[in-house]
């Protein structure tokens, strides 16, 4: 059964309705950013249905009442000692408890999670997944993962619901073949993912006997209408841009306040949600130094810096109220000045003269014989120069020197 969900509310209601129709009060989930985007877990919990994450990192985040901080490794901000404490204190309330003698050895932590999840896999009647790709020519859905939990969710329960963003659709298996090689190399550095699962509807007597596919819009058609921003829909969620970004490296994923962190989140979230309504969303296009490293590593060549600049312009436009602000007036003045060479030359001469006057009034000598301008009276300038020294202006401007020496060709030795 194929469903269309215009927004998050419709998507959550479709999944909840399937769960209610089968009389279940819990489901198991494959790691899916689309379900996080629509806040599916919270919506199901409001209707008395528990949604259990089965990806190890997502399980850690869920048991710790935390939020993911990375697209590929959601619990990267947790060390193994913290994970041990989460398992020991929280696992029992969600199902099979962790062993009393659990240590922080990775092998033991993985074994505790495996035993805890196995009971849920065997008990669950309904599973929810996303999809990395959907093949239009056959209706096949594809999930790539590394732990095997996805395959358990896709084969053991009687009912499977897959929530898929409409941008995940590729035309043919030939197109899919390209992405199956591209994604693992860009995300984990592997030639292929350990588990690649594909399913095309129901196979009698094998796997889920009822399959629902929910095609999710939730702002994607609006993004498609944006000629600059639409390239963000090419994202395959490899997280290469996060790993290269100096801003993400220093702030972490939680600082973005978004399901999608990092450079891709800085453009995807404002595109999906729109700007001008939420201060946190409006701040995301500015969470970048525009260094371009994200563009260099992106396997699908999303020009993230260009989209960031595009979104910054949209944020500015969204907050205009008809009255020019100080920044607007300053930018208009700068455009008027720098847009004409003669005006700029006059301004340089006037500025040089003013600087000389101020320099004479406030000049002071720094160690090493260098001169600088000390405190300047007046609004604005006094606040800046009270704690900072400004370099003393040269007696001759660059433009004047260039004209006099023909670019240095006639300069005396």
Regions found by a protein language model. Name each.
Residues 1, 14-26, 42-46, 183-204, ...:
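Iron-sulfur (Fe-S) cluster-binding modules
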Residues 1-228:
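The feature marks the mature, well-folded catalytic cores of soluble enzymes
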Residues 10, 193-205, 237, 248-252, ...:
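A glycine-rich phosphate-binding loop feature that marks nucleotide/adenosyl-phosphate handling sites
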Residues 41, 174-177, 181, 239, ...:
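Predominant activation on well-ordered alpha-helical scaffold segments within soluble catalytic domains
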Residues 55, 79, 105, 172, ...:
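Secondary-structure junction/capping motif
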Residues 168, 233-237:
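Short, contiguous, pocket-lining structural segments
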Residues 206-232, 242-243, 247-367:
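Ferredoxin-type iron-sulfur electron-transfer modules in oxidoreductases and energy-metabolism complexes
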